[in-house]
A protein has these predicted regions:
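Short beta-strand edge/turn micro-motifs at domain boundaries
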Residues: 95-117
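Short hydrophobic/aromatic-rich beta-strand segments that constitute the beta-sheet cores
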Residues: 37, 81, 109-110
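Short acidic-aromatic low-complexity motifs
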Residues: 1-30
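Short beta-strand segments that buttress and anchor functional surface loops
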Residues: 81-88
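A solvent-exposed, acidic/Ser-Thr-rich amphipathic alpha-helical stretch
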Residues: 23-77
Length: 117
């Protein structure tokens, strides 16, 4: 379970990191080159798609951070947990659940489920 927790932490850290070379490097180390990102507004693929998804969230809701808000649950290569999104000193603006599919230590699929307001 420690390895899974490490992957989830690296995933959330990547989504919270600012644009730049460090985020590009983090994306390459956490996600498979052919990663699929399924979000309510559409599907993206690959490292470039991951960068686009992160950049879109950060530009839409600047100053917010994702935090895990529930236990990590695992079934074979599927990992899921609840999250909240908000500013460090403010209220949460969204909540939901991530579903990750793993291949070894790489995330090959990320599906984002956003709770209804």
């Amino acid at each position: 379970m420690e390895a899974i927790e490490s992957i989830v932490t690296a995933h959330l850290d990547t989504w919270n990191s600012p644009a730049g070379p460090e985020r590009v490097q983090a994306i390459a180390s956490v996600y498979a080159p052919d990663v699929v990102i399924g979000e309510p507004q559409g599907t993206l693929t690959g490292h470039e798609g991951m960068e686009q998804a992160i950049a879109a969230l950060q530009s839409q809701l600047p100053g917010t951070e994702l935090s895990r808000s529930g236990p990590i649950q695992v079934a074979q290569d599927l990992v899921t947990y609840a999250w909240t999104l908000g500013s460090p000193d403010g209220p949460r603006v969204a909540s939901g659940r991530d579903v990750l599919f793993l291949r070894g230590q790489d995330v090959v699929g990320l599906y984002v489920v956003v709770d209804a307001p």
